[in-house]
Amino acid sequence: MIQAAGAVLWRKASSGDLEIAIIHRPKYDDWSLPKGKVEPGESHISAGYREIQEETGYESIFGPEIGTVVYKLEGAPKEVRYWAAAATEETGHPNPEEVDQVEWLAPKKAKEKLTNKDDRAIVDYFLDFGADTFPIILLRHAKALKRTDWDGDDGDRPLEHRGQLQAKRLLPIYMPYAATEIHTSDALRCIETIDVMARSLQKTPIFSKDLSEYGFEIDREAPLDYVQDLMDRGIPAIVCSHNPIIPKVVKKLVGKKYFKSMDRELEPAQAIVLHCRAGEVVACDWIDEPLI
């Protein structure tokens, strides 16, 4: 199946009203949401982030994943995953052979102009979530040495080779979220997980025992309080912690009823993204580990 990714790119007009971008493709003579194919080795969100810039000329900050569309293109099945994305600045122009017009319209007018009914449904899904969310990314550390293969203190247990490769490939997955802070457990395996990403983004990590396993054993409410504080202060953040901690924090924040669909352990380098507004979680996304 052909894999593709795109977004509902939105902004606020000078009046404060919401606008979304739709594009005209001369090849098909249609109006659509911006999207494009996932390249080999590329994650869906990385592809969506890249395609938005290429097809609209705008940089963006990604929010919740809002829906998936499956259809046939020239007889072959194609799956497109869509995110909400806030436009930040115009940094270029699309290739006119691929996109010759970009229009910013109110959602109702955009839906009227979109050619495909599936695109109109995606706009409706976006409106259900709403704009103006910020992410808190709860990232499990990458693959570490087994406890049975390590004689030292557990807090000093490092990443194994696969974990080091995973850590090097996190940046393209999480760059679209534009986190302003990186927080981490003080365990070495967590510190090593976020190191490349932090240096690439020029962010100084904030270390905390409240996010560690031994800290969790001392005070089981500490990680929840830590994440809730980030939510209350409206800080888009990456938080690197451990498997027994992250699911429990998410369960408390979203409630048992809504947690059922994600009630499983995270594999190394997987994450749950909490999309927040006004101190509350309005959507959650499960992020798979990087392809190795």
Which role fits each region the language model picked out?
Residues 38-64, 69-122:
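Unchanged
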Residues 135-137, 233-241:
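Generic beta-sheet signal
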Residues 29-30, 92-146, 150-151, 155:
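Nudix hydrolase/Nudix homology domain
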Residues 15-59, 150-158, 162:
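Conserved Nudix-box catalytic region and its N-terminal flanking loop in Nudix hydrolases
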Residues 1-33, 136-141:
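N-terminal strand-loop-strand
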Residues 257-283:
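Domain-level recognition of soluble alpha/beta enzyme cores
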Residues 219-235:
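A short, acidic, amphipathic alpha-helical segment used as a generic capping/interface helix at domain edges
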Residues 36, 47, 132-218, 224, ...:
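Active-site-proximal alpha-helix that buttresses catalytic centers in soluble enzyme cores
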